[in-house]
Amino acid sequence: MTYSCPFSIEELAYDEAVRIAHDTGKISGDAGPLLETVVDMLDELERPDSHFDCIQIAGTNGKTSTSRFAASILGGEGLKCALYTSPELVHMEERMEILGAPVAPEQFAHGVSAAREAGRRVNLRREEAGEARYTITPFDLLTVAAMV
């Protein structure tokens, strides 16, 4: 099953997507960083994360190495693997990989475009309901973008 964005989005150029990923201030509010921000943005996108199985690796040290080991093992067993890590070494799209290769700049820009629009829609709905707009952090935006 493949995923497609449930609404039209303005596709950003790569350079603009990188700029927005570094500074999410224009789509953010002042509700503070909350887990619900990412959940509501994914809900707005009709849960792209439900189209594949995920492994989350958490902890203080060694997350990227452990993630890469896991992706390599799973890929060696014939499974298609995507990887989302941080930080990047040189280019922001290095945070997102598919089958061991960084996503193309256009794919990165598409993910950021979809995440930005989802955040805008969620915050508009919150504002209309008299609720504080979510603070959408760069990490929130990129986490949602990686799922698209």
What are these regions (language model features)?
Residues 35, 40-43, 48-50, 76-148:
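ATP-dependent carboxylate-amine ligase catalytic core
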